[in-house]
Amino acid sequence: YLSYLEENSEDCINVQIVSADISLEPLLFKPVFVNDQCVLRTDENYNAHQGGGKMLSLDKNHILLSVGDFRQYELSQNMDSIFGKILRIDIRDGEYEIISVGNRNPQGLSRLKNNDKYILETEHGPKGGDEINIISLEKVNNYGWPISSYGNHYDGKVKESAPLHKSHNDYGYE
């Protein structure tokens, strides 16, 4: 399995997963997860994509995929968007369900030893706001980005669309 960012047009990026059987012949990749949602490129000087892209095998039919918000904060809380989420993907048909929202740039996914109900997720937050989260596989978890974070924006400014309140619990988040 390979996750990658696909540039659909000059200003549209989305996330795909393909797979191939390893052999001595050229690899023939088949689509596993194809989604037409995209985020727009920005022309900012510091253009970190915050794309996520970590995969974790759950069982023979499902993988998890972390998808960052690509610096488009509002997408993390939008349940109609795959961005700023962790997805459980059925590799047989590409269908997915959201297991975590309110993520900025989820980079690490790991199983917990002797536990199939939770995973461990690491996330690059804003300045001083990296997170380690224990995520339930049995319900949708909301980790609050961009409403709550213990970090600060790198430019030091307060943003209306991403206020970064310093409490997750006070705002109803994990």
Which residues make up each language-model segment?
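Beta-propeller domain segments
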Residues: H62, D69-E174
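Acidic, Gly/Ser/Thr-rich repeat motifs that build Ca2+-stabilized beta-propeller blades
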Residues: Y1-Y73, G108-G125, E174
